[in-house]
Amino acid sequence: MAHKKAGGSSRNGRDSAGRRLGVKLYGGQAAIPGNIIVRQRGTTWFPGAGVGMGRDHTIFATVEGRVEFRKGLKGRTFISVLPTAEAAE
């Protein structure tokens, strides 16, 4: 009678779901107030003109216009929303 001694249970096999971070609106795309542009942990991107930053560092549009990514000082990337001509009138 062949028997096998019971093996121990594995302590692996768990993983957390992805957090869905990253760029949601890219440069040149249209944005309206409240649109989320970037979800991030910490400040990979910094807020520029026409955008705000939430408690969790989410960058969102505060004006209607086009999204722009621009390099700034110290290697920082700033995100702005430039008002479109018809939105400014």
UniProtKB/Swiss-Prot annotation:
Signal peptide start and end residues: none
GO annotation, biological process: translation
UniProt entry tagged with the keyword Ribosomal protein: yes
One Gene Ontology cellular component: cytosolic large ribosomal subunit
Name by which UniProt lists this protein: Large ribosomal subunit protein bL27
Single GO molecular function: structural constituent of ribosome
Family per similarity comment: Belongs to the bacterial ribosomal protein bL27 family.
Keywords from the named record: Ribonucleoprotein, Ribosomal protein
InterPro entries documented for this protein: Ribosomal_bL27, Ribosomal_bL27_CS
